[in-house]
Each structure stands twice: as structure tokens, then as C-alpha cells.
Amino acid sequence: MKYINKKLSIEKVAIDSIAKKYNTPSYCYSSKQLRENIINFKKNFKTFSPMICFSTKSNTNTTLIREISKFGFGADVVSIGELMMAIKAGIKPKKIVFSGVGKTSNEINYAIEKDILLINAESESEIKEIDRIAKLKKKKVHVGIRLNPN
């Protein structure tokens, strides 16, 4: 953000004009700043060759996720809606991790059908359900197991 002609602006667009057009409160994203942040983030972790997953529960803006996907990011999703949205926004299924408690059979089935990278299981019953559905579909599924030592 910077002042242009005494008006606070984002990428040469005056914030007051955004407020007039879209009302307040509003969220504004700078695609230029987003790209710069992504490039810097990836550069700083380059030696580790990580697969970076954006947490879609933190922001479900499809345009934002589509932009992030252009840089090879994956997605960490917690519902079938987020999973569908991530795929629609251009995230490759093999770069999607499905976390979250209480996944339904329908959600697990859809995740397996889409051949996502990993399903994080939150309970013994969820592990059994993933196994049951995977066997029915004759598919191998990568499963992460979350443990709480307490």
C-alpha cells in the first residue's frame, strides 16, 4: 500500500474507491505482493525441496488459491467442499492433504476417488473406514496418523 495523489492505494487503486464500489468491510489482496511473498517463501525453503500446502480453511478465496496453485503449492483441506474447491482452483489432487476430524464416509470416498496425496486419520474408526473404502475400490491410500500422547 502507498499513497497516490494523497489517497491510500493498493496497486494503484484507491482504497476509498474500493469501499464505494464493494462497501465495507472488504478484503483486498495484492496479487503482485502475493506473488512476491510466494517467490521469497519458496526461495528460502528451496534447499529442503518441500511440498508446501496452503491451508484452505484459512482462506477459501478461489482466485487466491488459483494464483497459489500456479506456483506449485498444494492444499491442506478439512472438508469435501474445500477439497472440491481446491481441485476446481487448479490444485493437483496429488498435492492435496485431507485433514480434520469427523470425516464422513462420503468425504473419504471422494478423496480416494480423486486419488489425493494423503488422508490424515484422526481416529481408529476413521482408519478402519479408509481401509474399508480403499479395499472396495481396490486402491492404495496414503494415510497419515495423528497421535495425541496425552
Give the residues covered by each predicted segment.
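A charged N-terminal "starter" segment
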Residues: 1-119, 124-142
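Flexible glycine-/small-residue-enriched beta->alpha junction loops
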Residues: 142-150
